[in-house]
Amino acid sequence: MPPNSKSKRRKNKSKQHNKKNGNSDPEQSINPTQLVPRMEPELYHTESDYPTSRVIKRAPNGDVIVEPINTDDDKKERTANLTHNKDSMDSASSLAFTLDSHWESLSPEEKKTILRIEKEEVFNVIRNYQDDHSCSCSVCGRRHLAMDQEMERIYNTLYAMDKDKDPETNPIKFHLGIIKELQISKNQQQNDLSSTKGEVVKNFLSSSTVGSLKEEVLHFKQKQLSKQEQAHNETADNTSLLEENLNNIHINKTSSEISANFNSVSDEELQQKYSNFTKTFISSHPKIAEEYVQKMMMYPNIRALTDDLMNSNGQGFLNAIEDFVRDGQIQASKKDDSITEDEASSTDLTDPKEFTTMLHSGKPLTEDEYADLQRNIAERMTNAYDTASKKFKDVSQLEKELFTRFMSGRDKKSFRELIIQSFKNKFDGELGPSVLAATLSSCFSSQSKDTSLDTDSIYEDEDEEDYDDYSEYAEDSEEVSEYEGIEAVEKPEHDEKSNGIRETLHLSYDHDHKRQNHPHHHYHSTSTHSEDELSEEEYISDIELPHDPHKHFHRDDDILDGDEDEPEEEDENEGDDEEDTYDSGLDETDRLEEGRKLIQIAITKLLQSRIMASYHEKQADNNRLKLLQELEEEKRKKREKEEKKQKKREKEKEKKRLQQLAKEEEKRKREEEKERLKKELEEREMRRREAQRKKVEEAKRKKDEERKRRLEEQQRREEMQEKQRKQKEELKRKREEEKKRIREQKRLEQEKLQKEKEEEERQRLIAEDALRKQKLNEEQTSANILSAKPFTENGVGNPVSSQSHPNMTNYQEDNSCSINDEILKMVNSVAASKPVSPTGFNVHDLLLPSTNNQMPAMEQSHLSQPGNQNNHFGTTTIPNALDLATKSSLQTENNYLMNSQTLENTSLLMHNNSSPTKLLPNDFGLSSWGGLTNTMSINPTCKPPVIQTSEMKSQAHKSSPQATMPSFGLPNGGTHRKSFTDELNTLTSMLSSSGFADTSLSSSGFPPSQRSVWNDQKSSFSGPSTAGNFNNSSIQSGMLLAPTLGSVESFPNRTSIWDSSTTPMMNKSELSGRNITSTAQDSPAFMASNIWSSNSQYNSPYLTSNVLQSPQISSGVDESHILDSIYNTYLAISPQDSLNPYIAIGTLFQNLVGLNLDYSTFINKLISMQGAYNCEFFTDNNGSITHVRFARQTPAGHSKGLLNQLFSGLNDPTATPFTSRPHTSTGASFPIASSTTQTS
């Protein structure tokens, strides 16, 4: 590094000035390296751990150097390691030696595997090359013969020729014989004097002389450098020019001296002189010295170099080596077609880019990476050069190789500039410019010489061993005879085995003697111009056959093509001439010879690849093993270091612990002394206080005894008071319990009396209701019989009834037997104390189940109308009074709201002063009757409404002065009165044998599950119901028949049921003006065509769509009223003997017809009642709700009992479904007490 401070610059200038003036002072002439001793780091604490990367010292030139710490043992070990490394580097100076060692380490089986070459493998090598390169030479077929076909023919011909010579020849033996021929041809061409100086240098020494020659060359180089350091004072540029001139002059002088010496000295004297020199400087072994002298006498260049070493201490030798490298570089840079093979080989050998590409796994380096590599190598070589010993230290073989290649490569100028700059930066202050130039030149020459000598000698050993292995394989393959004959011929020609298989692998130096230049320079063994095929084995085994894209070499000893100097363009234009030349100019012998050489090269290439593959595989295994060993060693060192640190920490802890114990012991002694003194003082004080304490305790004891006596007396008084208080509290508690028991008993007695009274009143009302209903039924029966007799006798029906009345089915409901049993008990209790009705009516029969009971066949009366679609007259349906006894008051109200719209004669619903002409729209149609043999309905559970009070009937007759229909649609004619007595007797007998419904009727007159007392099994009946209960109906389940009457209006009466004329009706606009909502006008209903038909089943749907709800009715029903109605209906129809029975969802929905809810709304209401009413559901597999259950608890707004709600609507004797409207409020329930008062 250049000095930065002023003092250093002054010091350097003074040193240079002293050198220029030639100061004779012995102190000043001493080398600075002798004045500054070598500095070594000192360790003050040998047991301490010093970081190896933190020890810093100063170099002799002032630089700061960081080095690891070396103890005495480490120094000895390092010295031994350096000695061992030096010996190993001398014995294995290149990768070729490693490859040779690898071949020796292979087992015989592995060697056989490598040497076993098949025919297809040889042709694959040739084909792979042919795919990448196209050629038009004679060997390749002059563009019209396939290379593989020609080579296969040549191969078969050569194999047949060898087979004729030796019948035991096989492909493997044939391949080895071809390689042996290549070795023999190599030995024959070694005496060629046209080889270059570079090849002479590489071949003139054996492997045993390499180490000694390297040391001698370095010794001569150091002496020369010391002389040049004292002699040259010029600048670096002038020195370099002068050296070039001197080198040229020296070479001329050397040649002249050599010629003079040869003339003046005899051969014997020269041989003796050379022998002495060789024994002294090269090797003391006589055989080696003799071999060297023999080779030296054969090659004049070697003699010239030896004379230079003897006379001028090797200066001429170094200059010769440098000139050789320089000449090779100049020749490699020329792109002349006549370039020799040796020059191209030298170029390839010294091409640093190719070498770095091979080291980089076949990937070429970028320009930046290549420049960084050159700079690092320059700095490394500069730092490794020691000015004291004049040697390079700690330089690896790879660094030496890279340095040599960079110095002799195409970009050597730039690299040398880097070297010069690096040397100037480090040694400018110590060495002069001329010394720097000489040092660089000698270093480069030394490195080049070492590399060339190492490579040549190692290849000699390697090839010798390879030859032995081939011979061993031949013996194992029973092919010894041929190879023994070949060896017998070869041994007289060459004494050593250095010309074995290495001659096959070392092909780069045979090209000068075995080949002549072909116009296309075509050679088929390697393709060094291809970046993909350039690999490490080409460098190691020195098989670097030059190949430009249009240069191919062929060996032809006797024939030279006449087109050697012609350019490639002329060859392309003269393709036809070349084909003629191929056909006529070359004979079969030449083609066979060329083919044999191609096969030789292909086999050589295949052997190279196999050996390198085996080497890389073994190297990979060794690397893995080495890595594992290094990891294990690293772990061991780390573990030892940790153990050492742990021991040190434990030692420190023990030392600290002992110190702490000593401190604690001293402290304890001081504390004990203090405690002793303190105790003495305390004892004196305690004795004084003890006397005083005794006096005080005596006085205190007396006071305590007095206080204790007073406390005992106080405690006894408090215990007596507490005992008296507890006695008083016990007496008071007993009195309170007695009073509470008496009050509870009175309350229970009152409740019992109240329940008895309510039960008696309820039974009385039930009995009265039953009697009243029986009476009404009898009267209605008689009236219906009289009105139906003319129809039966005449057999005439209404021809248009099917167009004006819808098909209706009766309700179905499953009633609990518990309610019937309860009602039966109440009726029996009342009936037991009252006389039986004079009509022979049996109340017990009314409460029997209606499953198998037969009732008289009497259908509901109809109003016969002509076929006018605007007719609004309908049938009158009267509810059965018995149904009121089993339904709750709220159920009665809801059903009334629904069924009140089906009444035709609204005079039954109005006040007595109302007009008798008020009629209902014809929304519901009832089936006709045909006689006593007709069935009541297809559904056996259908029951007809047949109840009408005599008061209502009389009102209907009094209010109309003209001839009108009776309230049940029967005529007033007296022609049928004559048979009334007979009909009445028949009905009475039937009633006596039949029971009324076991279930209750709804307030609208349509009993859900009661059999008719007038029908037989074939009569048909229809009434308002859900769509799911219509017979043969397509109406979906859950559809409701909504009420259609908002207010009752009057309609004109008919004069006769047989009248075909139609009385003009009010139009829709008049109805809408009067707030009448009728769906019959928009949704026509259908009836059977014949009301007298005995088989009257309906085939048409009753309604085609859902009927809209009347806004007048829906406005009076709020949300809470709907929820209460659902809950009360559930309590009314659920059995009383079970706590929480499940009720079918359809049954509960059918009993809520009066609420005008569709099925989806009904389900939503039930879901909303889960929280407030404790509602629970039961679903099927599809998730649909099928049953519902309510907990029997009183919900919000339901404070009355079940029986109170069941009979709240019957408390008023005058309030019937035909005389009053039901309540629509939801906030209050129906009181029983007030009803009882009114009844009484």
Curated annotation (Swiss-Prot):
Residue numbers of Phosphoserine PTMs: 266
Subunit structure: Interacts with MSL1.
Predominant location: cytoplasm
Source species: Saccharomyces cerevisiae (strain YJM789) (Baker's yeast)
Compositional bias annotation for Polar residues: 25-34, 953-965
Listed name of the protein: Stress response protein NST1
Cited function: With MSL1, acts as a negative regulator of salt tolerance.
GO cellular component, one term: cytoplasm
Chain intervals with Acidic residues compositional bias: 457-487, 558-587
Superkingdom of this protein's organism: Eukaryota
Family of this protein: Belongs to the NST1 family.
Extent of Basic residues compositional bias: 1-20, 514-524
Region (Disordered): 1-76, 446-593, 634-744, 953-980, 998-1029, 1214-1240
